[in-house]
Amino acid sequence: MIEIENKLYIRPEKNGITVYEKDTNLYKFYENLEIKEIEKLNTFKEVQEYLDKKSNLVNTNIDYSQPFRINWLIEERCNLDCIYCFADDKMENNETRENILETANHILNLGFMNVGLSGGEPTISPYLKDVIETFKGKCSINIDTNGTMNQLGDMTKLLKEANVLVRITIDSVNPEILSKVRPCKNKNLNQLEIIKDNIKKLQKENVPIMIHTVVTQINKEYLFDIAKELVNLGVKRWHMYGVNYAEKCKDFYEEIKLTNSELNEVYLAVKKEFGDKINMSVYFDEGNYSANSVLLINSEGKFYLDSIKNGIHYIGKNPKLPTLEEINNDLDTKLHCKGYLWTPSLL
């Protein structure tokens, strides 16, 4: 895989190349285009112009032999107690720095284009900086964080150098609503103020930011307030998705979930008013909770699949060091790739 100015990540496939565009978060497959043609070019501008000329080759005919992305739950601890957290009952013991870096290097050897670092709360991990240094310039990095830890604002220069996309979850700017869906274990913590302070620090260093919002029946009427706050902060990217089923919320999931039509209705209403100020997007749940298409690593460094309602499945003879063949044997790689792959018909 080659990296172009921390903006493009290009990987050879059996029948072409896949290009991951960091700024747009799009994966594009160019059929029968060879990576050696890209290697002849020197700058991002040259590569982008060349790919634009080859846009007729973009399709979904990829040989599904290698997953695009993996999500690493690098830290099991969290300072919040979100009512719908899917990771709560899957966290295991922390590992040593040596073991953490072994996992990071194995991820690189497997050729993933994008690695998501989450948890728990990843900024609690004492090894987060080491992992980012290991990945820097070799793959694309996302961090999924609640944004309430000061550590996030203290590492902005490294995040900028590695072009890390920081995805911060804000489910409400109303303290009462926030305490219902994302209660803080430290009752004295003003999480909104810390989030805003961290956003300002990230913006000062031009670190890419995206806000995530989990939409439920509890907070759906308060999305306009979030939009106003994001505009005031100068945030340009906002992604919404409905709450997913998790063991933690199984007893009240039906009460808090939205149908896709309900989610679309509130999304379009907010977009109508704020779409010219914020780049907004939404994800609609397809409800396939049995599919083995999401690849994860727990805080022990074990690779696994999570079909949510059917539990987890560890991969390979040694789940800490599975081979690509073992991953593909268990992962529905085709469904995994289709979930990310851009198609021309979408525009």
Report each predicted region and the residues it spans.
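Radical SAM/AdoMet-radical enzyme domain recognition
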Residues: 97-117, 125-240
